[in-house]
Amino acid sequence: MGNSRFFLIMGAALFLGCGGPTLAQRQVESAPAVHALQDGQFEDAQKKANLVLDKEAQTPEARLVRAITRYRATTKQLYLDGRTAVIGAFDGGLNQRYLHSTAEQAEADLAAVDEDLAAAQKGSNVSLELCLACWKDVDWNGDGRVNIRDERLLQIEVDEKGEELPEDDPRRRPTFRFDHGDIAWARAFVGFERAVLDVVLAYDFSGINEAMREREREGAKRIVFRLIDKSRIAAAKTRLLESIEQSAACRRAYLEETDDDREWVPNPRQK
């Protein structure tokens, strides 16, 4: 009897000792990464999130911070590489190898973003407060300078009546509280982007070059894009179905919300 009681006590102690961190502990651990992200210090935020995740890989707040910083880096690089591919296509012809490597890298990077979002989605009571329009000196389009378009990109420029908000109106720069439903929204968004990239990777678009040469001679009659990887079409279908699933989860989460706290996407009962 004494031995049985001993093993029961030890088992309970081990079980409780192996439990994950509490919400308060998670928030304290992730606070430096969250604050860096709130200040628009994206690289620093990712480094600090990685430090947290090195200790506890499933910390949802740190995963969410890293997902956002990874997404920003991925989309910025994709924009730069895509612009290079388009300019090259008009200048000397489409570089299929460059286009393929660009799309392949972007899809892999977005897969890592989704992995972080999926981990964050499993957490309980996950939330993140961000004022997106408060991020300053961010070169969103990667042209090497920050102009008024960069500064206003994430601002709310008009009110509910369609009238322009004054520059000093705080409604231009609201702070949103992102929560569980918004993570599903983000996963759906990323999934649709990955599906597009899978379609790009499925085809050889170098037929554009032949069509352009034909047009110079006698006018192009058609452009042929050859399917080179059927598995990518199947992957695109999978991504689309997953995204539809996440969209449905997002809607359910929004409709179930009973609070009204700085919503990114409000339900009919929220502001």
Model-identified regions with their sequence ranges:
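Bacterial N-terminal signal peptides that target proteins for export
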Residues: 1-8
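Short coil/linker segments at helix-helix boundaries
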Residues: 28-29, 35-37, 43-47, 70-271
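Residue-level signature of tetratricopeptide-repeat
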Residues: 66-67
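Bacterial Sec signal peptide processing site at the extreme N-terminus
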Residues: 19-32
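Bacterial N-terminal signal peptides
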Residues: 8-17
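Short coil turns that delineate tetratricopeptide repeat
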Residues: 57-58, 125
